[in-house]
Structure formats: structure tokens, C-alpha cells
Amino acid sequence: MSETPVDPQQPWPGLASFTEETRSFFYGRDDEITELSRRVQRKLLTILFGQSGLGKTSILNAGIVPRLRQEGYCPVYVRIDYAASTEPAEQIKQAILRATESVGRWTRPGTAVEGESLWEFLHHRDDQLLDGAGKVVMPLLIFDQFEE
């Protein structure tokens, strides 16, 4: 995620989205952030869908992600590049490994086994991600711009 500089005197990033770094300037959507955060915690799949320009990426990056990070989630941002030679499932596996390596350690460290499905990758190790204090952290897959 690239950081967008925000002027405190005029804290609107224009067409750019708010980020975790600029969340202190993101106002007025607390009820939506609370509801969507609860929904993510209760459901295996939550879809945030709407017209372009409504602030979906901003509410995600500046609202939901910081709140869920405090609740023990590790956001894994995934944007599939269909033009790449790497299969989408492999891109997702690599995004998970990259995002989680800075958070802590896996209880059964390993890498992706060539040829395994994404489901197998997510389930075969009976693994947990632990932070530096030994608390379990839950990876949260975020597919932004998924409609592309």
C-alpha cells in the first residue's frame, strides 16, 4: 500500500483512498466500520460491494483493517494479476506468506507444496500464526478490486 500524504488543513486525499496511515483523517463512518468489522468476525465470507467512488477501499483500509488488526487479525491484501505467468492460487499463497512473515511465526512453518490447491495450502498444516507475545493471529484475506 502506498502512503498518500494528507494535509491536516485539507485532509481529503481527492481521488486516492484513505489508508491505515491516514485513518486519523477518516471521519463519519464509525457505525459502518463497527457493523462490517463484526460481520467479518462472524462470517467466513464478507463481500463489500458498491458503485465506484463510494469509499469502499477507504472504509476497508482506514476503518475495518485497523480495527480488526487490534482484534488479532493479520490483513493479507491480494490483488490478482491475471496477466502474470503465476497462477492466481499461487499469487494468493505468496501474498499470505509475505504478509504473515512480519507478524510472527507459524507453529508448523513450511512453504507451499508445488501443485497443492489453495484449499490444501490453507488447511493441510493444522497451523497457527502466533505474534511475538505468543497470541494467535488470524490471517484475513482481502481481495480489493476483485471485480477486475
Predicted regions and their residues:
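Amphipathic helix/helix-loop-helix segment enriched in hydrophobic residues with interspersed Lys/Arg
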Residues: 1-148
